[in-house]
């Protein structure tokens, strides 16, 4: 799968999310910056429980060891590493591979978690 | 499967209709035929008097002929049954029609009893039972000035209300020495008489009407047994009901001595193929004249005809209602007839409130209650009675006015109490989830779905869970979440004492993990009310809920609504035009809010800055509709225009709104100012309510509407403006400093040890010596206020966030609108599938954006 150049690193918002368009798919990209080592995560922007493209506007955090985003609509938590909804484990959103290179943010259109449904 | 059965229903009142509806829902195939004696299908008889205050017959209707047809329900109107042949299972109507049945259901209801008084059959002597009766009453009323209702029971008072609404001078005549003798005790009946008399209805109790003869001044004269008389043009009988059981008698079914078709626990009559439900049925020598037991019987019969299982076991006849505007409630043994029963009575002659509680001999159980003038205790009393709950040690607290602050005691809620109405989760479901091993909020939410709908029950749910944990001996920590082992109040102290300015600093010094959607917005609010930094400053951005981040209210489809501040609800014509033009240009849906301002819906994320640029240029500021902060200060028009106003309520509201706008708090804050005691601004339903007096202002505190409405308490009277503002400063600042997350002022005050009195001591008497400090803190916040939208528009970095995609100018294709009542609304999922191709709103919006730039 090909990598796509999405935006400059500066376009990310610290401890929050932005949304990118990748081959017609909406992808939420989060920058977690608790330490010197910035961590970037990418998941589908569509909240399958609220049925709207809003996850990039959710609040980041951790529940136990899981790094999560809370949907701004009904507050369910989705894991940023597995895409699984903590409240309804049968609901899984796509997780995308993401890398930082030369000050740019790259996304890979191939989903990382195969179990996520395309819908 | 058996062959499809023929079910025949006689009568289409509320109960008959409920039966048909329930049966069809359970069995889509069964043949249902309804024979309805009236000219229209079922309508709401409970709210019949609304017919005279503007409710149309269509609005009262419970169904339509189309709906019956669509569900395959056969029906005949104006159809009276002549005869029933039980052997052949055949019903013959007066038109000669014949209907075969497998099972027959009597839902014939009842008719108004007309006492055998000579002269009761004259043209303007009427009854109050059906829509046709109502038409006759209206016709007669047009030719009458004075009306009298014979019968002072529940229905009689309803009828009196109808006559009053028709503009007649209204009398009520009751044979018993008091009104509503079935439901109320004597003192309660007296209080009700007094209140109703003040509302302009003359009450005559202990009067036996002996004859209705021609009158001297009016059409008729009622002659009473005691020699007195009363003149009236219209006589309305409402002296009770009698079951329609003639048909059952004539076909040989068992009926009671005083009427009513005898049924067993399955609502079966003496013929196993014939059932009777509602007011025509007699169960254990009792007739149930309320709609709820009738519905229960309907469901019992539906269960008999389908899966089986349900049986009728009597019904609670407790009632709560508003008669002629007076609240009345009656529960269980209202007359204290249980041997050994004890009564507690509270009377407030000034407010005209009467409350009585009947308790068992040992004082442990509630047997009954009477409430007149204030039924706010009805629900909790009813729960005590129905669930046979153990009363508190001092049961009188339950009916005494809540001066000491009756706590929201979740533990005392019965298990059947509904906590989350969106997902219909009862307290018992939550307890079961905890029995099943869930012992934290998140777990309980995920397995019961409670609080995952509108979220309005979040605080109540937490309270239930905490209390339940406490009762199980689990130590409940008031910790905000897993990241901070502190309450909100403790965190606020840590922030202020430590001079902590960012979430990261607080987390590293006092917390663990990364934070979450609970602690981040809470800390954001604490930081804002401590230092009043711009909420979108870089370190604070990630703390805010989306509404605070984008300074707008997210709607279900991910679009936003925009609410400019309209302080006190006062707005110039020019500004109205601006709002209208903005709405037109961006194709927004407009709606007037309850807080006297205008909400603009359907703005997409990337449109918000352009919309606000226009609004800010025209002099608008953000309305903070998105924040846990001051929302609005509602006002009535006040002494400037109103004949009754005694102070300038609008001016006061505007000054107060401008003083506290932007103030971040544990929850939203609403206020109102009324210009006189008529209270048109509804200030007593607000966190801070102000009502003008001849001498100044009365201050009410800690009220709210919403899910658990609470009247505000009178805090101080006849204040001058300066004192008024100082008290509000102190109260709000104390609330911000000590309340829990998402705790409204009402719950906060109720949970304060000592309640309202304690609050008075701190605020008015300054017993803690805090007053000056609280005022200074408020002054600092007021002085550093800045409109967040103006600040955002001036900040290119902040503006960058207002785009759907970081790498594309496209709009979110999932936001699609359709037109309804000449405005947009979000398309349903089905509509989106159908019209995926046309997205007209996007084009309009893009055009508007292009013009802006």
Predicted features by range, described:
Chain A
Residues 1-66, 79-80, 92-119:
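N-terminal pre-ligand scaffold of iron-sulfur
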Residues 47, 71-74:
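Short cysteine clusters
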């Amino acid at each position: 799968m090909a990598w796509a150049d999405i935006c400059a690193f500066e376009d990310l918002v610290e401890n929050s999310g932005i949304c990118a368009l990748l081959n017609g798919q909406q992808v939420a990209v989060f920058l977690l910056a608790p330490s010197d080592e910035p961590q970037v995560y990418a998941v589908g922007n569509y909240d399958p429980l609220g049925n709207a493209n809003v996850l990039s506007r959710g609040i980041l955090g951790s529940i136990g060891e899981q790094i999560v985003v809370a949907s701004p609509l009904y507050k369910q938590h989705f894991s940023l590493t597995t895409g699984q909804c903590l409240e309804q484990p049968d609901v899984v959103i796509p997780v995308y591979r993401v890398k930082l290179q030369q000050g740019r943010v790259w996304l890979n259109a191939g989903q990382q978690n195969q179990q996520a449904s395309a819908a | 499967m058996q062959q499809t059965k023929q079910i025949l229903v006689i009568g289409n009142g509320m109960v008959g209709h409920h039966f048909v509806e329930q049966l069809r829902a359970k069995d889509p195939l069964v043949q249902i035929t309804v024979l309805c004696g009236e000219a229209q299908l079922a309508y709401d008889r409970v709210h019949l008097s609304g017919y005279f205050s503007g409710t149309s017959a269509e609005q009262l209707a419970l169904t339509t002929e189309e709906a019956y047809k669509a569900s395959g329900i056969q029906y005949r109107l104006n159809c009276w049954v002549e005869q029933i042949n039980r052997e052949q299972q055949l019903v013959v109507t007066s038109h000669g029609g014949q209907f075969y049945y497998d099972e027959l259901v009597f839902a014939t209801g009842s008719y108004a009893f007309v006492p055998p008084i000579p002269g009761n059959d004259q043209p303007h002597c009427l009854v109050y039972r059906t829509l046709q009766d109502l038409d006759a009453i209206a016709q007669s009323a047009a030719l009458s000035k004075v009306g009298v209702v014979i019968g002072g029971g529940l229905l009689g008072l309803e009828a009196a209300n109808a006559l009053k609404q028709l503009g007649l001078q209204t009398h009520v005549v009751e044979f018993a020495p008091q009104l509503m003798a079935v439901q109320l005790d004597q003192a309660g009946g007296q209080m009700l008489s007094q209140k109703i008399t003040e509302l302009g209805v003359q009450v005559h109790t202990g009067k036996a009407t002996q004859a209705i003869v021609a009158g001297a001044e009016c059409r008729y004269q009622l002659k009473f047994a005691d020699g007195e008389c009363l003149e009236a043009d219209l006589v309305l009988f409402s002296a009770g009901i009698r079951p329609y059981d003639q048909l059952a008698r004539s076909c040989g079914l068992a009926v009671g001595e005083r009427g009513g078709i005898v049924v067993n626990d399955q609502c079966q009559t003496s013929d196993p193929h014939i059932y009777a439900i509602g007011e025509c049925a007699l169960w254990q020598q009792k007739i149930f004249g309320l709609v709820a037991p009738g519905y229960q019987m309907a469901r019992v019969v539906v269960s008999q005809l389908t899966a089986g299982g349900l049986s009728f076991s009597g019904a609670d006849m407790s009632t709560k209602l508003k008669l002629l505007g007076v609240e009345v409630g009656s529960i269980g043994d209202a007359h204290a007839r249980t041997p050994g029963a004890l009564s507690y009575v509270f009377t407030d002659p000034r407010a005209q409130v009467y409350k009585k509680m009947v308790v068992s001999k040992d004082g442990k159980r509630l047997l009954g209650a009477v409430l007149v003038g204030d039924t706010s205790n009805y629900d909790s009393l009813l729960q005590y009675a129905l669930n046979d709950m153990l009363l508190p040690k001092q049961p009188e607290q339950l009916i005494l006015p809540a001066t000491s602050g009756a706590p929201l005691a979740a533990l005392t809620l019965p298990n059947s109490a509904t906590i989350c109405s969106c997902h219909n989760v009862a307290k018992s479901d939550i307890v079961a989830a905890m029995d099943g091993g869930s012992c934290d909020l998140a777990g309980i939410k995920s397995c019961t779905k409670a609080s995952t709908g509108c979220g309005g029950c979040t605080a109540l749910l937490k309270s239930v869970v905490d209390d339940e944990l406490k009762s199980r001996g689990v130590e409940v920590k008031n910790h905000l979440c897993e990241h901070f082992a502190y309450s909100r109040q403790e965190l606020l102290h840590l922030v202020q004492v430590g001079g902590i300015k960012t979430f990261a600093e607080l987390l590293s010094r006092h917390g663990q993990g990364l934070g979450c959607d609970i602690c981040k917005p809470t800390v954001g609010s604490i930081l804002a009310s401590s230092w009043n930094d711009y909420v979108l400053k870089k370190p604070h951005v990630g703390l805010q809920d989306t509404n605070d981040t984008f300074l707008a209210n997210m709607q279900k489809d991910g679009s936003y609504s925009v609410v400019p501040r309209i302080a006190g609800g006062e707005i110039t014509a020019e500004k109205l035009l601006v709002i209208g033009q903005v709405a037109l240009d961006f194709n927004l849906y407009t709606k007037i809010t309850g807080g006297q301002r205008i909400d603009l819906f359907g703005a997409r994320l990337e449109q918000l800055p352009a919309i606000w640029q226009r609004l800010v240029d025209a002099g608008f500021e953000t309305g903070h509709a998105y924040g846990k902060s001051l929302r609005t200060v509602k006002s009535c028009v006040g002494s400037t225009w109103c004949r009754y106003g005694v102070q300038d309520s609008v001016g006061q509201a505007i000054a107060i709104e401008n003083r506290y706008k932007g103030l971040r708090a544990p929850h939203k804050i609403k206020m109102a100012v009324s210009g006189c005691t008529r209270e048109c601004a509804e200030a007593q339903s607000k966190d801070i309510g102000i009502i003008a007096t001849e001498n100044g202002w009365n201050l009410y505190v800690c009220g709210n509407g919403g899910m658990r409405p609470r009247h505000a308490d009178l805090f101080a009277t006849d204040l001058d403006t300066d004192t008024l503002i100082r008290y509000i400063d102190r109260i709000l600042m104390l609330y911000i400093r000590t309340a829990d997350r998402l705790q409204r002022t009402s719950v906060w005050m109720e949970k304060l040890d000592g309640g309202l009195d304690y609050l008075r001591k701190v605020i008015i008497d300054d017993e803690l010596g805090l007053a000056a400090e609280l005022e200074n803190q408020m002054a600092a916040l007021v002085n550093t206020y800045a409109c967040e939208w103006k600040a955002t528009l001036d900040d290119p970095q902040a503006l960058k966030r207002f785009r759907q995609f970081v790498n594309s100018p496209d709009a979110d294709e999932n936001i699609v609108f359709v037109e309804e009542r000449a405005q947009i609304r979000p398309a349903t999922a089905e509509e989106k599938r159908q019209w995926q191709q046309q997205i007209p709103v996007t084009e309009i919006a893009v055009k508007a954006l292009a013009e802006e730039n």
